[in-house]
């Protein structure tokens, strides 16, 4: 049976050799499927995927990203099917994931995907990464986690230092423009609370109250801080228009300010590319406050409604996670040809003449943390970051809730457009909150904000009623 697996991105140079070895091993293990990876380039991902789904193109497995096109949206349009009828046959696969990870794959009371457990989500949202050498050079022995004013001062001094060092003006970045300033939220008296990250419309309080984030005091505070930062030149003036790759290109040369993106491995890249002796560490405001667990799972793999055999995808995942050997083969290729293992959990990739890794499959789509290998030059802090388990954490009541937007499709698409037009310029500090928020909220309301939030509250109330443990867990 074919096992066509649709993912975003592009295939590695030596894909054919690697996947042939995977199929050989599957055959030797008596698994009657033939794996083929179908990649859709990021730039065309939304359009191409929608086209595949609407035309009924046959494939077996779909990678689902909750922050791009979430599982409930795919399930609501009938693109993926419930896996519950088949799970009894795969007890080992079921046992690989925690109860909370499985909660993250529920839609209308049924499991619609297999979780991908590639990292801990205990520290997903509110961290910043900072160049420690620069921080110390400009007079801060440690990250000033108790004061936003000091963080801004650190950013200003770091910007000047990095400009002298690299000739590049460094900026504070969001991971994506849609993101919320979660790092600031830890400094507010109303914390813990969580703002849903894909649109930022929903502010969820720990008691289950759903507030309108863009109409909240918290959003006002975020904007006032970012206005100060933008006016001080700490945010790229072209942030809403430039290609996102610019931020990574600059960061790899050492030019970034404390930001809610990047990771400790960035420090290694900077050293390799520039020779600057630096380390990058993850920090947060008010570390004594609890972590916010805001999702049980961020990536999943689902069975396509157009699958030739509904179990091919499950057979593949069951085989993939059955051993570290299978996991190594699929993700890293043939030992000695595509990679060399370094100890139990490190790896050296073999590259082609253009310095491209010959063969690798992204672990964030199909990896399993206990089996994953990290680059031999990745700092220990990177592994700590990926595997971190919080001692002190609260779980957001919306962590396991997946909103089904099918009743508010029109409002949703109008709001998506309007948020970019009216909210982004205020959020990144380009224009002042005071002068622009009333018009922005009026525009959101015209686009259907209240209808959207009412639908969200209705579904969320039903979810709380069906799952009374949620608010207990959120205490």
Where are these regions (language model features)?
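Extracytoplasmic/secretory soluble proteins
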Residues: 1-475
